[in-house]
Design a protein with these regions (language model features):
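Active-site-adjacent substrate-binding region
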Residues: 90, 100, 219, 226-333
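C-terminal motif of bacterial Sec signal peptides marking the signal peptidase cleavage site
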Residues: 15-19
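N-terminal capping segment at the start of a domain
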Residues: 25-71, 82, 297-312
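Acidic/histidine-rich catalytic neighborhood of metal-dependent amide-processing enzymes
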Residues: 140-245
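Bacterial signal peptide processing site
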Residues: 21-23
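A non-catalytic alpha/beta surface segment that caps or lines the substrate-entry region
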Residues: 57-113
């Protein structure tokens, strides 16, 4: 994903998107956290962590590599083993360089027969370049993507494992988007489109070609870097613009789930991420759970570096995000 500098989007405040600093407007709209039942189903962070390791054991999942193909097979079989119906949406997608990435969006559906549905999604590919690494000699090294890729998929698999206990009132589609992290590195910026469309290729494709004709969902929740040791999640600007009510509900659910230390009820930055085409093209109000860390490393210290490895994953962050999702799902009627 590509971070959008707040200063470039000052006009967004006039559109109700807020600013990159803490404001009271959104937090004052948060609901009553004391009148909703708290689910007793518990997210297992150790299980989710094991799923991160399993993906990383294949190596960086860069499109058009054997590691990518092998991990795709693994994710498909894991969801199938949990009793979900799985669709592999194949597409040949063009990168900013004009290369063709053989891509697969993986859609795993719980109770596909139900009309009322929600989406939980993440990207599963790895960035080909560690272009934010402190060591410039490593900038052309692929990223392992334990946090920026594998963590979201791992949380989804663990949530899917618990659905028979949770007994949700709605169907759930877990979507693993491919080819998200191939935006131009700094040495190729001259080739990059100005609208950020070199990122999030898989979600752009799905948003224009959903896996089911006429597909709709109540809302979507995007998981992006949900295992960082330094993670803090603020209201993301694009989410507030298109899915404000869902955003506030989700952050309220986090307070009930005991994850208020992670989900700060204040406004953060903006991200060019998979939720943008989901909101703007598919028309599904979608929230982005993405870190907003004040300082030099907005998305966390391991973002797009060779240090994005399993040993730098926090089980507490996985637990907080996963438990928040279980709470949010349990509140659907």
């Amino acid at each position: 994903m590509k971070h959008i500098i707040c200063a470039l989007l000052m006009v967004a405040t006039a559109l109700g998107m807020g600013s990159c600093k803490n404001q009271n407007s959104a937090s004052q709209e948060s609901g009553d956290t004391d009148t909703v039942a708290v689910t007793t189903v518990q997210f297992n962070a150790d299980s989710a962590y094991a799923e991160i390791v399993a993906q990383c054991d294949f190596g960086p999942r860069v499109p058009n590599t054997e590691a990518h193909a092998a991990c795709c097979r693994y994710i498909v079989e894991r969801f199938k083993s949990l009793g979900l119906s799985v669709i592999e949406q194949k597409a040949d997608l063009k990168t900013f360089e004009g290369k063709t990435w053989h891509s697969t969006n993986i859609i795993a559906s719980y109770k596909p027969e139900l009309k009322d549905r929600i989406i939980i999604c993440s990207h599963w590919d790895s960035r080909p370049w560690a272009d934010a690494d402190p060591d410039t000699a490593k900038h052309r090294t692929p990223v392992m993507a334990a946090n920026d890729g594998a963590s979201g998929v791992a949380v989804m698999i663990e949530v899917a494992r618990l659905l028979d206990q949770l007994k949700p009132a709605v169907g759930i589609d877990f979507i693993c988007f491919d080819s998200e992290d191939g935006g131009a590195p700094y040495w190729e910026e001259a080739k990059a489109p100005q609208d950020g469309s070199d990122w999030c290729l898989g979600s752009q494709y799905w948003s224009s070609h959903p896996h089911v004709e006429g597909y709709t969902a109540r809302y979507g929740i995007l998981l992006d870097m949900v295992g960082g040791t330094d993670a803090r999640y603020c209201y993301e600007g694009v989410s507030l613009r298109y899915a404000r009510d869902v955003t506030l509900r989700l952050w309220d659910a986090a307070q009930r789930a005991g994850a208020g230390n992670l989900f700060l009820q204040q406004e953060g930055g903006y991200a060019q991420d998979d939720h943008v085409p989901m909101n703007e093209v598919a028309g599904i109000p979608t929230v982005d759970i993405i870190p907003f860390v004040e300082g030099e490393h907005t998305f966390g210290a391991t973002w797009h570096t060779v240090s994005d490895t399993p040993e730098n994953i926090s089980r507490e962050t996985l637990r907080g995000v996963g438990q928040t999702l279980l709470q949010m799902i349990s509140e659907e009627k």
